[in-house]
Amino acid sequence: DVAPLDRGENVRREICLTLEEMNIRPESSHHEQGPGQNEVDFKHAAPLTAADDVITFKNVVKTVAARNGLYGSFSPKPLADKPGSGMHVNISLARGGRNIFAPGPDGAYSPAMRSFIAGVLARAGEICAFTNPVPGSYARFGSFEAPRYVAWSHQNRSQLIRIPAAPAPEYARIEVRMPDVSCNPYLAFALLLAAGFEGMERKMELAEETPYDLYTANAGALE
């Protein structure tokens, strides 16, 4: 096989191997849409460990990049007309070893998941000040699969919260697409969990899904 024309491939490999030596397990790494833009996904972990991993990851990226004559930038919007860089946060909850976001026998979303999503959406405007703390954070919103509106959907990447396809019930999770890597991950994860738990405690009702692409929707659809 011919290797892809991706100059970052070897750098990503070095980053992933370094992370593994530090007991951080990357699940995938690949070139993203923008020039010089790369993505690394981690294996799930408890919130505090995940936040620690984000800090370690940023330092590893900058160190390995510099070693290869490159600069590792975590700017949410480094180029005005190109895709920005987010930090999508995947969340699932377990009780007694069972994923309580797992769908029921009929495939319906669990009440716990629905209320958790409702809680995060209700607090999204306030949380945004912490998950997206710099001016470039807001330049990223509204294009190239970055959300603009407080909405959720199954699979649609234009929404603030997406429910990814799960190969089995135990992998059910939500993906919060608002945060970027300029945030403090300890605050970001704590606020997202607190908002979700508030939704569960208050048994908040989840609004209807927004199944269409919000980047191309007309004004009437957004009312």
Model region roles, listed by residue range:
Residues D1-E223:
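Glycine-rich, acidic/polar active-site loops that bind/position phosphate-bearing ligands
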